[in-house]
Amino acid sequence: MAFSPANSFLINKSICESKEVEPLEANLFGKLHNKLLICKAKKENLEKKLAYQMMYSKLLKSLPKLSSLEENKLTKLKAPIEDMENTKKELEEIRKQSTETELRYLKSLSNTLSFGTLSLSNEINKVGPSASFMLKEVHDSVQVLEQRLEKMGLIEKPSESSESSIYSILASLKHTNDSLQKKELSPHEIAESPSSHSTSPMGRNVDTETLSFLLIDWQRLCAEQNTFLRDITNNMSSSVPQDVLSQLRQFFFRSELLSDKLSNLCSES
């Protein structure tokens, strides 16, 4: 046997995790990865919800002045934007939580890769012809890790070395770990386009019937969203079911269609 069972599992797990392939056994990485998926799903949903609320608010302002008899209907139509400020706060918090979770995940991955590389160096003489293949796999794993950190702005300058030697890999991992130690997380501000708060009049008046239909769509989507996110939360300790992810994708797709419908109404003149 070229590798001891412990070292072989550790190295393969490092490669597996860095390439985002689901590990066969439940472990810390699996739990962190599931939590990260949940954070990202919630973040994406809140971003869509806030975009919807801002667009809906803009449409609501374009309504013609209603008579006193229609005030009850107007109150009902305002329901989708009643918690808009709470949505903003919740989105800011989930963005921070998502970033922190991903950082913990990547730190754990970096430590595992470092230990796996050291384990590999201890048994390199036993590997023979497959040594170069294993080193290339670990090197590629480190590059994937660096790319993810670069996207998060948590690494100053990724390694450009194409050398897959033990020394080169350990040097890259040291650079990665040093960068992770230096960086401090800061809360993410919600990026809003200037047009989202525009008070300019709409090109056309939107009737209450149109908004009523949109409100029905909104309520249905919210009910589905709560069901899907609850399903994900209940499965945190295991792999996230593919059918749940598929349902989430369908929800997000329908949400995008609804956003497009709102955008078209806003752009019509």
Curated annotation (Swiss-Prot):
Positions of region (Disordered): 181-203
* Modified residue annotations for Phosphoserine: 200
Query: Basic and acidic residues bias: where?
Result: 181-191
Q: Where is the composition biased (Polar residues)?
A: 193-202
Q: Which GO terms describe its cellular component?
A: cell cortex of cell tip; cell division site
Q: Which GO terms describe its biological process?
A: mitotic cytokinesis
Which key words are in the record? Phosphoprotein
Q: What is this protein called?
A: Uncharacterized protein C16E8.08
Organism field:
Schizosaccharomyces pombe (strain 972 / ATCC 24843)
